[in-house]
Amino acid sequence: MAPDPVQTPDPASAQLRQMRYFTWEEVAQRSGREKERWLVIDRKVYNISDFSRRHPGGSRVISHYAGQDATDPFVAFHINKGLVRKYMNSLLIGELAPEQPSFEPTKNKALTDEFRELRATVERMGLMKANHLFFLFYLLHILLLDVAAWLTLWIFGTSLVPFTLCAVLLSTVQAQAGWLQHDFGHLSVFSTSTWNHLVHHFVIGHLKGAPASWWNHMHFQHHAKPNCFRKDPDINMHPLFFALGKVLSVELGKEKKKHMPYNHQHKYFFLIGPPALLPLYFQWYIFYFVVQRKKWVDLAWMLSFYVRVFFTYMPLLGLKGLLCLFFIVRFLESNWFVWVTQMNHIPMHIDHDRNVDWVSTQLQATCNVHQSAFNNWFSGHLNFQIEHHLFPTMPRHNYHKVAPLVQSLCAKYGIKYESKPLLTAFADIVYSLKESGQLWLDAYLHQ
């Protein structure tokens, strides 16, 4: 039986905890399938069965590491680890037995140890510290574009040309605000979580009309287990709409499952992917999310966006014109968002969680796009997706500085570090969908 979790950190209980030793077999059995959830951080074993529901980063992201070593994701996601460890004391139930390795045999020890040395080097170099002027100017350029969009209609009227220009400017505002909220959501701007969360609410809530809690819930899972089926929500379109990855597509075919004609998915992707995700799904689901979970602060920030848009554009366009502008902007933004966010992951390895080490988890699911001033701006520096996934709290203006160090690490251990031109990255989304669709069809018909 599992030992009862210790609730109050006093000296006597601390001594008892030091005497409790566990094996990896015992830890692996507490993966959540039987309700109990344990995880390991720096050889210490924590019972997160009840705490997972109260976890500030979301219940699912921490549960995805139940039964596993979570040392590297713990370090990667938290900016004030000392404070977090104090709250973790009440969850501590023991540690790994002395004869047990520090992590599971599925993980590369030499690679993990060297990556941790790289992490320490990166911190000593100051690459985890943000240049606040960079983010201030980035915010100002978004606000200026927002004002320019309104001035275009106010000065030049609402005929086709100024209306179209306004829509393009507003789409740019929404896309760039999406990249900026991503920075604050990852706690990569300020040294305290409080300030990051506050500005995150402003950017994603007031500038975009979306809830911060929804983004945290979805995006942190993606970073914890990228391209892992049933753990990464970014691939939840498998198998309902798409057959993704070689492994999962063949599995689906062998099981004789056909929710869609997957062998044509590289064609209908252009209809239900880039143009539809935001206006036909996210736009409505986010309201369901905040109401269902009673996220009233998020709802207030979201409503402030709609109130602002209504009172600034309604006098110029009327209700029909405003609705037309709004959905054109969401349509354009959706295309921008989907192509950029999918180019780094969909063409890469997609599978079930194999519980490999942190570096392998991120590199097998992630690729980069070549650096240029335009690519950096257009993608919000997500063209450095590998560096971002390895160091999610690193300010984006430092990605190019750490990239050579990451490349050296990958070369030493024979890990493919893939970077490609922007248009090639876009095309690879379609090619990978075509390939996995064909693999599904072959397995469906012949296996």
Curated annotation (Swiss-Prot):
Pathway involvement of the protein, from the record: Lipid metabolism; polyunsaturated fatty acid biosynthesis
SMART domains to which the protein is assigned, alphabetical: Cyt-b5 (SM01117)
Annotated PROSITE patterns: CYTOCHROME_B5_2 (PS50255)
Protein function: Acts as a front-end fatty acyl-coenzyme A (CoA) desaturase that introduces a cis double bond at carbon 5 located between a preexisting double bond and the carboxyl end of the fatty acyl chain. Involved in biosynthesis of highly unsaturated fatty acids (HUFA) from the essential polyunsaturated fatty acids (PUFA) linoleic acid (LA) (18:2n-6) and alpha-linolenic acid (ALA) (18:3n-3) precursors. Specifically, desaturates dihomo-gamma-linoleoate (DGLA) (20:3n-6) and eicosatetraenoate (ETA) (20:4n-3) to generate arachidonate (AA) (20:4n-6) and eicosapentaenoate (EPA) (20:5n-3), respectively.
Motif (Histidine box-3): 385-389
Protein's recorded name: Acyl-CoA (8-3)-desaturase
Membrane topology annotation: Multi-pass membrane protein
Lineage, opening ranks: Eukaryota, Metazoa, Chordata, Craniata, Vertebrata
Record-listed N-acetylmethionine modification sites: 1
Gene (UniProt): Fads1
Chain ranges of the Cytochrome b5 heme-binding domain: 19-97
Record remark on domains: The histidine box domains may contain the active site and/or be involved in metal ion binding.
Known tissue expression: Highly abundant in adrenal gland and mammary tissue and moderately in liver, kidney, lung, spleen, thymus, brain, and eye.
Subcellular location field: Endoplasmic reticulum membrane; Mitochondrion
Residue ranges annotated as motif Histidine box-1: 182-186
Highest rank taxon of the organism: Eukaryota
GO cellular component terms, semicolon-separated: endoplasmic reticulum membrane; mitochondrion
EC numbers: 1.14.19.44
